[in-house]
Every structure is written in structure tokens, then in C-alpha cells.
Amino acid sequence: MDIGIDLLAILFCVGFVASFIDAIAGGGGLITIPALLMTGMPPAMSLGTNKLQAMGGALSASLYFLRKRAVNLRDIWFILIWVFLGSALGTLLIQSIDVAIFKKILPFLILAIGLYFLFTPKLGDEDRKQRLSYLLFGLLVSPFLGFYDGFFGPGTGSIMSLACVTLLGFNLPKATAHAKVMNFTSNLASFALFLLGGQILWKVGFVMMAGSILGANLGAKMVMTKGKTLIRPMVVIMSFMMTAKMVYDQGWFHF
């Protein structure tokens, strides 16, 4: 598939903007996947190429959070293992079953997350009581978070952040940092399976990855410096935008 230099430049910018937003609030795939599909790329290859570029952004943001000691891998290694396994299973299943019913339910889930953050203004301002240990979170929650990202994906960052706030008691910047490390892990598992299936356009993926790395690094810095004032409105806005796009794509507004 031949992609011109002008289109590659646009995709570089798309990767930058999407990863900047994704590092703060999630929802970057809302931008990158339609952009890839508009190039005429087959859907499966669009998903595989998107996982490649998303890995660059997720890794860049994750390394930044690790350098700033916002995340301690010794605490969450068990969580990451189960996120990886869940994502691998989700990626395998998405290639073999009908997801029509799931797609109809998903907008309500994403909308609920946005409304939850909107109407609980103090949620995540400070660390709260931890409801689940890291071990139980890894066993009971992580597989489903990874499965969702591998199976479908939109809003994964927001869902992971909400789980960290409500179940692990993290403040919002800390939850966002941990969600990004989990998201990188799930992307890695999904990418590996798309790689085995040959569903990646490398040139496009690497160009978008370059933009993604720059955007994610800038977004991660914003989380650490302006987290409490920036993350909540971004999560709410992206949740509403994802909901609107999903219901539009399903034809709810087509008369």
C-alpha cells in the first residue's frame, strides 16, 4: 500500500495530538483509528498499525512517569501480568466473534464514566482508602481491563484510571500514571498478536509512533504539573466525545 509523504506528515501530526490527549485522559484511538481508515487501509491492518503507534506513545509516557517515580513497578508487576494476559485473550476473541451487541452497550459505559467524574468533583483530589490490595486487583480486575483493551479499546485509559481511583484509592494524577503503564502493557500484548497475523503497515506505524512519542511525553508532563486541574475536565470531555462518535457511527442519528 503506497502512502504519500503529504499523508504521512498528516498522520505524524495525528499521532502527536492523539497521544497528547491520550496521556492525559485516554481516547486517543478515537482520533487515530478513523485517520488510518481514511487512508484506505483495511480495518484489521488499521487496528494493528494503530497498536504499533500507540505503543510508542504509551511507552514514552510510561517511562516519564517511572522516571518521576509516580509509578513503582515492584508494586504493580502482578497487575501488569494479568493485564497482558487479558489483552492477549481479548485480541484473539475480537478476530472470531460478533461484537455488535457489545458496541451497542459501550456508549452507555463511556458516558457513565464521564458523568461519574463530572458529578463527583472531589473524586481523585487526594489519595483515599484502598479497597483492594494489589494482589486482589490483579486477580479480579486487571484481566478484565486488559481484555477490554485487546477486545475493543475505546476509553481504556479512562476506565483504567477510574478503577485505580475507586479501588486502589489513588489520586487522579497517580491513577493516570498507573493507567498509562497498564495501557502500554495491554498494547504490547495486542501488538504481538497483530504482528503474528501480519496486520501492520510498518512505514505508517513508525511515522505515527514518532509523533506519538513526542505528544505522549508532553501530555505526561502536563499530568505531573497540572494534573488536578487538567485531567478531570479532559476525561469528561473525551468521554462525551467518544460517546457521541460511537452512537453516530452506529447510525443513531441517521434519519
Language model features: what each stretch is:
Residues 41-50, 73-78, 169-180:
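Membrane-interface alpha-helices at helix entry/exit sites of multi-pass transporters
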Residues 12, 16, 20, 51, ...:
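Residue-level signature of the transmembrane alpha-helical core
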Residues 48-101, 187-234:
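Selective hydrophobic functional segments
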Residues 144-154, 190-198, 242-255:
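Hydrophobic alpha-helical transmembrane segments in multi-pass integral membrane proteins
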Residues 60-70, 107-132, 241-255:
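Transmembrane helix exit motif
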Residues 73-82, 106, 129-135, 177-182, ...:
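Cytoplasmic-side transmembrane-helix entry/capping segments in multi-pass membrane proteins
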Residues 1-42, 127-176, 206:
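Selected transmembrane alpha-helices and immediately adjacent juxtamembrane segments
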Residues 8, 51, 107-110, 114, ...:
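Residues within membrane-spanning alpha-helices of integral membrane proteins
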